[in-house]
Amino acid sequence: MKIALLGYGTVGRGVDQIIRDRVGSVEVARILELPDRLSDPRMTSDYSEIVSDPDIDLVVEC
């Protein structure tokens, strides 16, 4: 399952870490973040990139 996180503050980073460490069947594929904070290739500041991606199964607001 591929998910997208909306936000990458304290909660978003924690969710990403837990999924990487403990949930092998789930991948954080996209992350919505502010334009000046795009530090990871999974990140975008354009919400439409996430909602139009057919590979995203679940969107999580963090």
Placement of each model-derived feature along the sequence:
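NAD(P)-binding Rossmann-fold cofactor-contacting core
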Residues: D21-P41
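Hydrophobic Val/Ile/Leu positions in short beta-strands of Rossmann-like dinucleotide-binding domains
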Residues: I3-L5, E61
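Short acidic-hydrophobic, aromatic-tinged amphipathic segments that line or gate anion-handling sites
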Residues: R42-Y47
